[in-house]
């Protein structure tokens, strides 16, 4: 009677193993890059710039068309896109089906939390956070000048710009604290995926423009990463590169003085500022990168 029992246990164990193998998680969605063209259209592409496609409708009159789209953000899993429509509606797009719905009225510059469950955004009341479906809207930092929010890697805090200062607040509400305050205009704060480094744009170069800088979280020397006009830094999900917007001439030369620029493009660099290279084609203007998926 012993052998059949052992045989039964062996068969049952094999079925459990086989079942686990069949239930392995699906492969991750490839990394998705989003940006807007500064003229009311939002695009997505692969992280190397290939596979470019327009996600939002083509806008006629940029000054009055309610479909004007800007400030897009890709969800962490790369399946959804949030963006601002008409300067006041937050829209959510399924990147596979193309289905679009309005999840909030009265906000702009949406950004996803690291787990994809919440969206932080700017509004007349300050920085707010809501569930991805638009429910449970909460103001976490008051003041009508707060904008450009980004979550910390663990989702517990949001960092943003208030009048040229970089400020951080608990994502569940609480006392805000100033992270960087000096005589310069500092904006576009964003954390590295491991939370060790903060990147931001600032006019501290004194060249009638803005450059990208990095500083260790907790303090330390501020390190310049670009010496030409650049804004909107964002780390790739694996932390290996920083994507950003840079200003150029019509011929594609990066400029120092913003008054000499004719267009914008996306570029990428290694986090120490080296290996700077154009990412988007010269046939289109591009700004405000966001990255999701790929992990």
Describe the role of every protein-language-model region.
Residues 1-18:
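Sec-dependent bacterial lipoprotein signal peptides
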Residues 20-295:
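Sequence signature of WD/YWTD-type beta-propeller architectures
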